Each structure stands twice: as C-alpha cells, then as structure tokens.
Design a protein with these regions (language model features):
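Non-catalytic signal-transmission and effector/linker regions of two-component phosphorelay proteins
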Residues: 1-4, 13
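Conserved acidic carboxylate
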Residues: 7-8
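Two-component/phosphorelay signaling modules centered on CheY-like receiver
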Residues: 11-33, 37
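Short, aromatic/basic amphipathic alpha-helical patches
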Residues: 16-21, 69-73, 95-104
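Conserved phosphotransfer microenvironments
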Residues: 37-40, 50-77, 87-90, 95
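Active-site charged/polar residues at nucleotide-handling catalytic sites that mediate phosphoryl
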Residues: 46-47, 106
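Output/docking surface of receiver
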Residues: 87-114
Length: 114
C-alpha cells in the first residue's frame, strides 16, 4: 500500500481525489487542510509519504515557487518520494506552461490538469 499526501486549496476536489484513491485499496491517503501547507513537510516525513500530490495556483501558499521549494526540502528528507502537481490549464495557461517546464527539468515526477 502506497502512502499519499494530498495538499489542495480546493477542499471539494481534495476530498474527491482522496475518496477515489482510497477506494482502490492501493493507497493510504492523508489530506492537508487548506491553508495548512506548512504541515506538508512534517506529515510527509512522519508517514513517510510515497507520493505528494499538490495543487498549484497563484495564491501565495500554493504558488509553483513555494511548491518547488517544499519539494526540494522533502527530496532531501525522503529520497524515494514522488511529486505530482495539479493545475488548471484553462484558467492559467502560463502557470500550466511553467508546470510542464518543471516536469521537463525533472523537478517533479508528474503533473495533472484539473
């Protein structure tokens, strides 16, 4: 069973993703409450997380820069953890392009469009 930490601004989307992953019985999912993005480091280290799925947006706690900074810190603590970013390519095409670049630069393992 894989441990996944989900950190999203949109609570409804976070709940839906967590529910879908849990139903497969292949994943144990922990969610970080909106606005509590600082909890990601300690929660991922405590589990330890196999995958960290995070939403990126223009809001300060969810920016690509802050997410990549967290990934850099977590990579040192949990070398086997995989990182996936979720973004809305329709409402912010430039942010979506930056996420694709982060994948091409191998700073993240995967990205998803919402």
């Amino acid at each position: 069973m894989k441990n996944i930490v989900v950190s999203m601004q949109n609570t409804l989307l976070s709940e839906a993703i967590a529910h879908a992953l849990t139903e497969t019985r292949e994943f144990r999912v922990e969610q970080i409450l909106p606005g509590r993005t600082g909890d990601a480091l300690s929660l991922c280290a405590a589990m330890p997380a196999d995958i960290l799925l995070m939403e990126v947006s223009r809001l300060s706690a969810y920016t690509l820069e802050s997410r990549l900074s967290l990934i850099d810190r977590l990579s040192a603590k949990i070398p086997g953890c995989k990182f996936a970013l979720l973004c809305d390519e329709n409402s912010d095409p430039e942010l979506a392009r930056q996420v694709v670049c982060a994948r091409q630069d191998r700073r993240i393992d995967a990205f998803l469009y919402a």
